[in-house]
Structure formats: C-alpha cells, structure tokens
C-alpha cells in the first residue's frame, strides 16, 4: 500500500495553504457590495495577467456548455483557490506556471489515476493523495463540491420539485481545480528563494 503520490510530486511544506485563509476569502467573496465586486473583478484580472497558462486552462473548462451550478462552482473555486495562494505567498514567491509545467502536472494526474486504478486493492485514490498534499485547500473544495451536488429546487417552481445537478460537469470542474491547486503548489518558492529541498527533487 502507498499513500503519497507515485506520479504526483509532493507539495513542499512551505507551500501549504492554511484553511483560515480560504475561510477569509469565502467571506469576502460573499460580500455583494460595489466595492467587493470591484475587488473581485481586479482579482480575476490579476489571475489572467499573472497566470496566463493556468487561467486559459480553467477558461477552456468553464467555456464548455456546463450545468449552471457547475459553472458557478468553477468560477468560485478557481478564484478562491488562486486568491488563497496569492494572499499566502505574494507575487514574489508565487512563480508563473509555464505551459510545460501545466502539461507535466496534467500528465502526472492522469498517470496517478491509472496507477491506482490498476491496483484496485489500494484504499487511497487521487482525491486522498491531493488531500494529503494540500489538506486545507482540498477540504474547502470538497465542501463546496458536495454542496453543489445536493439536489435543489428551482426558484419559483411549484410542488417542491428538485433539479439534479450534472455530476459529470461538476467532476470536470473539480478536476480543473485539482490541476490548479497542484500547479500553484509547485510554483511556490521557499522563503529564502533557495533551490527546493532534496525531498522534492528526488520525488
């Protein structure tokens, strides 16, 4: 049995995002004031300008004909996760993710899933691996994914009928957020900007 990722590189301890940061961001995103909306627009603009490869990858997913709940979830989680990294590490420590790094992470995710699918007796899957690497981020993501999958009533609908959310669309959004999380995690520099530790280099 193995718990850590076989294909996914470990996230350095200095790149862990705290749960409290995400809680603060969630509260700020719930603010519907004009000032808060302006700040949100600025955050999306910074994401696009500082992480063009990542923002394009997320946009490709969100530009699909997705279920409206999955679409809203994707916009919310993508900006919340990116803001968490920005606020935690700042522009000096958070490097731009290159096209090569993005492609390598996508391949690592696919390979990790294939390796674990080939060992059906393994109790840990991709979700578990990423949760170990970024526990605060993944707990936040899972909370909102689970909430999105709950059946809900249409506004103004009579009889209490509920609408099922498209689980495949939600899963596509979730996968894009996992990719975003891992790419940003490996883009973080240590406090002193030194070369990453031997644990990551040997992974």
Task: Name each region found by the language model.
Residues 5-203:
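Long compositionally biased, domain-poor regions of proteins
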């Amino acid at each position: 049995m193995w718990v850590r990722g076989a294909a996914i590189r470990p996230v350095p301890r200095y790149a862990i995002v705290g749960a409290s940061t995400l809680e603060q961001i969630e509260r700020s995103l719930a603010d519907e004031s004009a000032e808060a909306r302006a700040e949100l627009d600025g955050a999306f603009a910074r994401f696009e300008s500082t992480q063009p490869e990542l923002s394009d990858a997320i946009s490709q997913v969100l530009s699909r004909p997705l279920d409206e709940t999955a679409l809203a979830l994707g916009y919310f989680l993508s900006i919340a996760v990116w803001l968490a990294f920005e606020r935690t590490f700042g522009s000096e420590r958070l490097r731009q993710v290159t096209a090569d790094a993005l492609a390598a992470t996508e391949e690592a995710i696919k390979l990790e899933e294939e390796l674990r699918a080939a060992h059906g007796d393994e109790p840990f899957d991709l979700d578990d691996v990423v949760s170990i690497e970024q526990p605060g981020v993944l707990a936040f993501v899972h909370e909102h994914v689970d909430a999105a999958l709950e059946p809900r009533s249409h506004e103004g609908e009579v009889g209490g009928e509920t609408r099922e959310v498209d689980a495949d669309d939600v899963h596509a959004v979730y996968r894009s957020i996992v990719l975003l999380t891992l790419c940003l995690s490996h883009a973080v520099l240590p406090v002193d900007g030194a070369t990453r530790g031997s644990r990551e280099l040997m992974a």
